[in-house]
Amino acid sequence: MSARTTQLRNTVQTIHRCKAVHVKSVPVIEMFWQKVAWDGVVEVFRLAGHPKAKRCYAWSYTEGKETRFVTVLEVPPVESAQTAVRAAIASEAKK
């Protein structure tokens, strides 16, 4: 497992207080108004001990000099890496 994936797994476990096992990496390109809103790799984790979700999607990005981590639980309407990215973008847009 790469250092990035390990760091994301640790972030998922800390935030969601459950065990996370890496399942796969999924490339995602999310378009918005015919422009790329996000292009990267989403890590998929199987969760053990979480009361609401069996999976979590996680990724990181750089903002300025800081690395930011994003985790999105697989609860409706989130059902894939693609919909996790959409949900995160929508959540940020509301802020």
Model-derived regions: residue spans:
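Mixed-charge, Lys/Arg-enriched low-complexity segments
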Residues: M1-I15, G64-K95
